[in-house]
Amino acid sequence: NFKGKIIHPGTDCEMDEDGYGVSKKIASDWIVKSGSNTKIIKTSIIGPELHSRVSLLEWFLYQTGEVEGYTKAIWNGVTTLEWAKQCKNIINNWEVTPTLTILYSNNISKFNLLLTIQECCQKSDVIVIPKELGKDKSLKGNVRVKDIKEQIIELFKFYKK
């Protein structure tokens, strides 16, 4: 009989109708109904990677020249540092935390998100070109965190230590 506590990472991909999105939705629904020792943090994250450069942040940091930023791809996720802070908060307040926590920050287009990252890390070797593409993948949340620009500044400061 398992007595441990688990924080399950949810995702904005539950909106997708592919196998991954459907499986994440099924898992999330089951945990909400039956997972007494589990909390879900649903959000979308950006942050550094250890071994690849496929996520938005790492991909962008290694680009030069022109890159496209999608003006219709709306996002309101959090940095990995903010996600970790929220995990700590849930652990410290387990009994009063709802099973499902949906983190959200300000809505921002991927175009403006790239410009924000560029500004925060003073990246001058890339030009972000707006492209009208994408869809709204913002989440309706129940825990508002600080604006993404503040989070990105904190993230870069944290990793410069």
Outline where the language-model segments fall:
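Mid/C-terminal beta-alpha module of Rossmann-like enzyme folds, strongest
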Residues: 84-136
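Structural signature of the Rossmann-like NAD(P)-dependent dehydrogenase/reductase core
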Residues: 5-10, 39-42, 102
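Helix C-cap/helix->beta junction micro-motif
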Residues: 2, 34-35, 121
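Conserved Rossmann-fold NAD(P)-dependent oxidoreductase catalytic core, especially the SDR/UDP-sugar
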Residues: 1-21
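Amphipathic alpha-helical segment in the mid-to-C-terminal domain
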Residues: 80, 110, 144-148
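Short aromatic-enriched loop/helix-cap "lid" or pocket-rim segments at secondary-structure transitions
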Residues: 50-55, 113-115, 139-140
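C-terminal amphipathic/interface module of NAD(P)-dependent oxidoreductases
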Residues: 122-161
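NAD(P)-dependent short-chain dehydrogenase/reductase
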Residues: 19-21, 25, 29-77, 82, ...
